[in-house]
Design a protein with these regions (language model features):
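Conserved N-terminal subdomain of the carbohydrate kinase-like
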Residues: 2-26, 40-129, 280-284
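Charged C-terminal helix
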Residues: 21, 72, 248-314
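Short pre-catalytic strand/loop immediately N-terminal to key active-site residues, enriched for Gly-Thr
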Residues: 27-33, 214-227
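Active-site-adjacent loop and "lid" segments of alpha/beta metabolic enzymes
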Residues: 29-36, 47-48, 52, 63-77, ...
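Phosphate-handling active-site elements
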Residues: 49-53, 213-214, 240-254
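Conserved phosphate/ATP/ADP-binding segment of small-molecule kinases
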Residues: 133-214
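Short, small-residue alpha-helix embedded
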Residues: 162, 224-247, 251
């Protein structure tokens, strides 16, 4: 018998006209350990109320102790993934993680330029595991091609200062504003600098422009070696911007989310600690019961983070 059913959703069916979750076009590598990469991005974005559109740029060969090798995808494969989904789904924010090769950087920078007006959150990881020549080629391409498309550059203080200010000769370390000034020479308006050392076992995390400090949040240093913290933070920031939160508030919320992820971190193998991006989904501890909190009082997404929907402001 002929099947005459129409697969097109009716107007009154769920999902037919509802806006749904804000979507982030997410470029990053596969990480088999789940420490970072696309796995971490998807979990972090979902936890704060956005939907990741993950585009695989390659794959690490790694365990929880460290990265042993990387296999980059061909730029044609990366481009086909991105264009196919972007032609179907409206994109609120583009998130850039590790792209794997100068060729992929060139392609993704061109794509970001085609989406003029869509914010780009770019994260620069520590690349010390890689070969020196590949590091230099990658950083040069990222500086020349990707930074001019970047709205917010995210990275650890030591990583960004060595990259953007290699000839720094001051008696003090460069400040976040110094780093922001260097990034602004390539067109980056905001830099989120993490891990700025402070006295008494604290660290500062600073959203800065060349002219001013926009946000700074101090946290107590956690005595553990983590993998995936930078991916978690940049993914959460991109997702919160996609939902409509303005940049200063999104930065604060992303930092608080990261702190909770690290505080609840776990060690699945013999190496580093992994952020628990789903801390809110774990069973309530006895201490919460003693405090009189009802079971299940901590929940994810827009209600928890009080995120207005889809009104991104820079």
């Amino acid at each position: 018998m002929t099947d005459t059913r129409d697969d097109t959703p009716a107007d009154d069916e769920p999902g037919s006209d509802t806006p749904g979750l804000a979507c982030v076009l997410d470029f990053n590598a596969n990480d088999p350990s789940g420490s970072g990469g696309l796995t971490g991005d998807v979990l972090a974005m979902g936890s704060v109320g956005a939907h990741s559109l993950p585009v695989v740029t390659g794959s690490y060969a790694r365990d929880t102790s460290g990265i042993h090798d990387f296999y980059a995808f061909d730029e044609d494969a990366v481009g086909e993934q991105a264009r196919t989904i972007a032609e179907d789904v409206p994109v609120q924010v583009i998130k850039v993680g590790f792209l794997g090769s100068p060729e992929n950087i060139a392609l993704i920078a061109e794509l970001a330029d085609d989406y003029d007006g869509v914010p780009v959150v770019a994260y620069m990881p520590n690349l010390s595991w890689w070969e020196d020549e590949k590091i230099d080629d990658y950083l040069d391409a990222f500086r020349e091609l990707m930074l001019p498309q970047t709205s917010v550059l995210v990275g650890h203080h030591s990583t960004l200062r060595r990259w953007l200010l290699p000839d720094w000769e001051g008696e003090r370390y460069p400040s976040p504003r110094d780093i922001a000034r260097a990034a602004s020479e390539q067109g980056v308006p905001y830099v989120l600098v993490t891990g700025v050392p402070l006295p008494e076992q604290h660290i500062d995390n600073v959203l800065a422009t060349p002219e001013t400090v926009v946000v700074h949040e101090k946290f107590e240093r956690i005595e553990a070696v983590f993998a995936g913290a930078g991916d978690t933070l940049s993914a959460a920031l991109a997702a919160l911007l996609a939902t409509g939160m303005d940049l200063p508030e999104a930065t604060r919320e992303a930092l608080v989310y990261l702190d909770r992820c690290l505080d609840e971190g776990f060690r699945p193998g013999m190496g580093q600690v992994i952020p628990d991006r789903l801390f809110w989904a774990q069973p309530e501890e006895a201490e919460h019961e003693e405090d009189g909190e009802p079971e299940g009082s901590l929940s994810p997404g827009n209600d928890y983070f009080e995120v207005p929907f889809n009104e991104t402001k820079h």
